[in-house]
């Protein structure tokens, strides 16, 4: 199965200051558990979509430091206020389904 996780607000806290983002360890542990059980993990972010800044190298270093196991890191996710998709799960619902207690 393929899982696609947003980065900011899903696996880490952020107030649009990516340098100050704090990882959600419990979420990262769950992602790593999925990875280790053979699931395909994609990390997807809109970092730089509005500003045009290339955050790829910084983001790769950051998620490596946090120990997030993944197969792909994709930038270029569009910025939006509401995302409608037939396969989307809200991060808070996913936390609840997986008994994750995330504090921001």
What are these regions (language model features)?
Residues 1-104:
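Catalytic phosphate/metal-binding cores of nucleic-acid and nucleotide-processing enzymes, i.e., regions
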């Amino acid at each position: 199965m393929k899982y696609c996780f947003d980065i900011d607000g899903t696996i880490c806290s952020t107030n649009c200051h990516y340098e100050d983002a704090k990882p959600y360890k419990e979420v990262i542990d769950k992602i790593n558990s999925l990875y280790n059980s053979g699931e395909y993990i994609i990390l997807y972010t809109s970092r730089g979509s509005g500003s045009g800044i290339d955050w790829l190298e910084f983001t790769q270093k950051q998620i490596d430091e946090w120990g997030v196991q993944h197969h792909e890191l994709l930038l270029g996710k569009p910025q939006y206020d509401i995302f409608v998709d037939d396969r989307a799960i809200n991060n808070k619902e996913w936390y609840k389904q997986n008994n994750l207690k995330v504090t921001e």
